[in-house]
Amino acid sequence: MKRLRYIGTISILLSTLLFFSCGTTSQIINEPAEDQPLTQAPEPESQHKKHDKDTITLLFAGDIMAHSVNYYITTYEKIWRDVREVITDADLAFANIEAPLDRTKAASSYPNFNMTQKYVQAAVDAGFDVFSLCNNHTNDQYKNGILETIKTTQAITQYTKESFGNDIYFSGTKETADSKLPALTYNYFEANGWKILFLPITELLNRPDASDYINFIKPDSDSRKAFIKYAKELRQANPCDLFIISIHTSEPEYTRNITERQNQYYMDLLEAGADVVWANHAHIIKDRKIVVNTKNGRDKLIMYANGNTISGQRTKPELTSKNPASERDNTGDGLFYIVTMHREKDGSMKIKKCEPYFITTYINTANEYVIKPLNQDFVDYLYDVPRTNWAKYIERRIKINKEATKDLIEWQ
């Protein structure tokens, strides 16, 4: 019999228990000129701290977006400056790039996004290693935009490897729709002595164009059953320590509700061999669930949505509201979910620790959108500056996120 328990603490220790859209504006952006080199990150040669080889720490972010307001900043490095240490402390950090990267066109915002190479490079420099490229905005620039995205990500990968020796992984788009090639693109690599299999998919697209060039799985029952079978066979063909599936899910945006159909689908994927199901699309934070003592002795994890990591969706936060919990206010916060896993000698895998690290998109006095930790230290800073309305707002947002989302443990 399954038992589900709510865990109310920030850090979970399991070692012993074992009608809004994505838009705010619709315009072409003239990206500010930058005198800085392509990368800004300090000490990139030691991007991640090293851990015991039988232990791996993963950080899962949410959606990296770029609305017009996000481009108006002196340097993109500033976006990540106050959370970089948290990201680099993990062995691997994952994020979803929610836009094409077509260097032949100008940057653009909602409804047809196009992100710049430098914007994504800043996220890489901040410590992210693994990116999903498939979501409802992947084909915003049509087929050519997908092909240009692949070229841009290859350039980022090559530049980062040659300059700093760091391996970066992108998947979710395809160079050809030839049915003779593998149906979906994925990453299969080794990190810190762990073999990782990463497979991203999207269940929705904003237009039908070039869907064959994207890891697109329709959300109907037959397509999901076929994907479960595919995932099982993929793991069998690629022996790994961790199999992570990213899903840009066909569920309503801006709601914390989790449907039983959605939950069962993710549980079926765990049963088929996935160790982690990492879902996004809601643009707000949802619950997490740790599945303990599964039949094969492997602890597993579901993240239902980690919200926006960076965006311009919250342009007018309700600073003076006593309960700033509107849909737009919720889009301004995100989650870094930090998971520590341990390989046992008998081949089982245990989740030792899960830490929800809440973040928020802050609009500074220069009207720049930057990521800040959603914690008391940031509140104290705001009172000292002083930006009293912001301080009170962040206090309320901390309370809302702690009360509205939770970590669950399910024993099987």
Listing of model-derived features with the role each one plays in the protein:
Residues 18-21:
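C-terminal motif of bacterial Sec signal peptides marking the signal peptidase cleavage site
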Residues 29-142, 149, 156-163, 167-170:
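N-terminal catalytic scaffold of extracellular/periplasmic and nuclease hydrolases
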Residues 49-55, 65, 238, 313-412:
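A short C-terminal boundary segment appended to hydrolase-like catalytic domains
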Residues 67-68, 101-104, 132, 138-150, ...:
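Active-site environment of divalent metal-dependent phosphoester hydrolases
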Residues 71-73, 77-81, 188-243, 262-264:
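Binuclear metal-dependent hydrolase catalytic cores centered on His/Asp/Glu-rich metal-binding motifs
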Residues 90-102, 134-136, 205, 231-256:
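Short acidic, glycine-rich surface-loop motifs adjacent to enzyme active sites
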Residues 104-124, 240-273:
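Active-site-proximal segments of metal-dependent phosphoesterases and phosphodiesterases across multiple
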Residues 127-130, 260-335:
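Conserved beta-sheet core of the metallophosphoesterase superfamily
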